[in-house]
């Protein structure tokens, strides 16, 4: 008859290694070189944390067990041997029960909403690791392409001289992306404005929202486009003498936010 093989993986969790965060590193993702990343997470009152993801084949491994700083609140781990320029999805596994994305990630993958983002708006969006993870996962990538600014230095108008047009990307252009928004700059400039204030563009819950329900404060919501597309929009605004102001709701955090889930 047919023979089926299976395997079971056990990992015995010991006490975390106590070691100081290397000098010069900040909370979040630290790119050491093209093959190395150090992740730093502020998470007081936790017993142990693993950084689990594509780099560890989504398994608990000694190499992904985070060190605990002597402050008893900051966790860190250095991941080596990474492929240059590859996007790695990952999560934090905390105290044996909680899986969360990195609260300071600059990009996340959403199993519920990413499928509704068009290729035109976000070309080349990597697949969610279905069957390996659940919930939102964060992403790191070494050797990211550098954007060359056409306007490397921009002096915004004085506060008292600002003529601001506030807009919601979702409702202002039918395509709902930065690429199309760039095409409207001549119209906005003809109105006599010298600043555009964008309603929140950081990752919020769902795709269609005013943005005042943020879940990741420094990750751009992919529904409006890529980081490069956003930079092109800002660069184009500056080329037209238009400042860009971001509406940020720092006092809000909703259920998908790791900062909510962790406490």
Stretches found by the model and what they are:
Residues 5-15:
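C-terminal edge beta-strand
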Residues 98-151, 260-262:
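Core domains of carbohydrate- and sulfate-ester-processing enzymes
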Residues 5-7, 36-38, 74-76, 164:
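Intrinsic-disorder/low-complexity, polar/charged segments enriched in Ser/Thr/Lys/Arg/Asp/Glu/Gln
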Residues 108-113, 145-146, 150-162, 168-263:
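Substrate-binding/active-site clefts of carbohydrate-active enzymes
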Residues 1-3:
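Short, solvent-exposed loop/turn segments at the edges of extracellular beta-sandwich modules
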Residues 17-24:
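Proline-enriched interdomain boundary motifs that mark the N-terminal boundary
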